[in-house]
């Protein structure tokens, strides 16, 4: 597993032999074509990282120590495609690690909150999804709760964004996860009717689960 992790990191950080520069003598068209595949190789490595988190579950937290820095770097890239893929990978890893993500709460929280202001809808949607999972899974309640209202205030306007179906669905799921974990820290009477109005979800049907879980929990 260590060898696999090292190979993945070398790809993500562009140090793998398959990513070596073709040199000055390479044809310009070849270089251009090569650059188009550079990101595909890295994106595939990110997919493998996500698959490892699925396979290892909580045990993946040890490997995240290795992947965190290079993946977070892409999450702050100037390229929206790179940001979106990195933030999406981070979100999936949080969900798969479960409460084992707790030691990484501070850094992940800071990044994901920052990406709520991203100009790219896909990146923003992935950040919303990741934040919901972090609020749900992390046991670092002190760190999470001191940012709760800040997160909610940033999410609330997104509940009215009918133009971005996936972002709207992820926002509904995120707020529902926040309510389920800490119901006393969200104005439920104000937000619950708005969440109900968003049903049925239009694109990300997986987010139905946290919404209905939250409703059932409130009724118990």
Language-model segments: which ranges?
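Karyopherin-beta/Importin-beta family HEAT-repeat alpha-solenoid scaffold
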Residues: 1-220
């Amino acid at each position: 597993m260590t060898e696999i992790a090292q190979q993945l990191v070398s790809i993500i950080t562009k140090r793998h032999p398959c990513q070596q520069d073709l040199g000055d003598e390479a044809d310009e068209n070849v270089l251009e074509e090569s650059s188009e595949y550079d990101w595909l190789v890295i994106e595939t490595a990110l997919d493998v990282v996500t698959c490892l988190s699925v396979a290892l579950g909580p045990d993946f937290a040890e490997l995240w120590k290795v992947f965190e820095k290079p993946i977070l770097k892409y999450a702050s890239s100037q390229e929206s495609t790179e940001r979106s893929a990195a933030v999406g990978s981070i979100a999936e890893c949080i969900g798969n690690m479960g409460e084992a993500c707790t030691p990484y709460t501070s850094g992940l929280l800071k990044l994901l909150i920052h990406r709520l202001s991203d100009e790219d809808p896909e990146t923003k949607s992935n950040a919303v999804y990741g934040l919901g999972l972090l609020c749900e899974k992390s046991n670092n309640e002190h760190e999470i709760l001191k940012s709760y209202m800040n997160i909610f205030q940033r999410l609330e306007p997104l509940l009215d964004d009918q133009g971005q179906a996936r972002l709207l669905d992820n926002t509904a799921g995120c707020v529902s996860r926040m309510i389920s974990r800490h119901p006393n820290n969200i104005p439920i009477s104000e937000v619950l009717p708005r969440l109900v109005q968003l049903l049925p979800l239009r694109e990300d049907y997986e987010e139905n689960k946290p919404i209905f879980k939250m409703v059932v929990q409130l009724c118990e």
